[in-house]
Amino acid sequence: MVNAEKRQIAKRLVERFLACEITNDEFNDTFPRDKADPALEAIYSNLWSYYDEQHTHKLDGRHTLQPETRGLFERCAAFLASGLEYEWPSYNWISPKYGLMRLFGLSRKINDEFERFKTSGSFEVWPFIREADYRRALASR
């Protein structure tokens, strides 16, 4: 279920983080969560891996995002503004179990699980599931 109010807050946070207006800590501490809207959790947990949690910073200097990663953040903002339901299957981007599985030599299982996840839609436009949805969202901005 789309939580429009929380998505608007999340969208603005993603945009402000990209514009170097807020720090990683501000982004992390104020990003809204809602178990009834799986897009919020999926976007939060995916973006979490692209910034340093060890110290406070903005996305500039050595923390400047690569173009591909910047595109991911921009797609997330566009998705949050789209009003679309999140259609991807559940996937925990930051699960501690993956670290343990790698430690015990189960990397292939993790990779296979992720590859199955990616085939659920057009992964190049995640969090959109279809390229057409992404194009429509861009056209309406």
What is each PLM-predicted segment?
Residues 1-141:
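Acidic, Ser/Pro/Thr-rich low-complexity regulatory regions
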